[in-house]
């Protein structure tokens, strides 16, 4: 019996919906990353993008345990001398709540060329509504 290898042409992606309200960030990111990679399918192949699309709503209400809200920082660098800036999670939650989840999921994807394509399958929205109702997403509990 030969090992099954998925082909790019045979993959039929589905859409999944995850509600982030009150869910710990790490658990949410693991679930989303596994769906995006296709790890939940029997046809998973590491070298082919077999993953599905993930819609995350209520990104502003994601839970962080402990004192991470005040202590954790995101570092940005402009490329110029003295161009390093840091922003706390609490500030990012107010301004760009989508960034927190996108950053966590990106860190859980492989560091290769396929990961850039996989990351385009993640759609994060700060509020209750999203623009992908026509795709009939399946609700996933975390």
UniProtKB/Swiss-Prot annotation:
| Pfam families in the cross-refs | Ribosomal_L13 (PF00572)
Q: Which GO terms describe its biological process?
A: negative regulation of translation; translation
Q: Which residues form a coiled coil?
A: none
Q: Report which superkingdom the organism of origin falls in.
A: Bacteria
State which residue ranges cross the membrane: none
Which molecular-function annotation in GO is an example for this chain? structural constituent of ribosome
Q: Give the CC-aspect GO terms.
A: cytosolic large ribosomal subunit
Listed A to Z, the keywords are: Ribonucleoprotein, Ribosomal protein
Q: Which SUPFAM superfamilies match?
A: Ribosomal protein L13
NCBIfam families the record matches: rplM_bact (TIGR01066)
Q: What does the function comment of this entry state?
A: This protein is one of the early assembly proteins of the 50S ribosomal subunit, although it is not seen to bind rRNA by itself. It is important during the early stages of 50S assembly.
Q: Describe the protein's quaternary organization and the partners it interacts with.
A: Part of the 50S ribosomal subunit.
Which family does the entry's similarity section mention?
Answer: Belongs to the universal ribosomal protein uL13 family.
Question: What name does this protein carry?
Answer: Large ribosomal subunit protein uL13
What species is this protein from?
Opitutus terrae (strain DSM 11246 / JCM 15787 / PB90-1)
Taxonomic lineage of the native organism: Bacteria, Pseudomonadati, Verrucomicrobiota, Opitutia, Opitutales
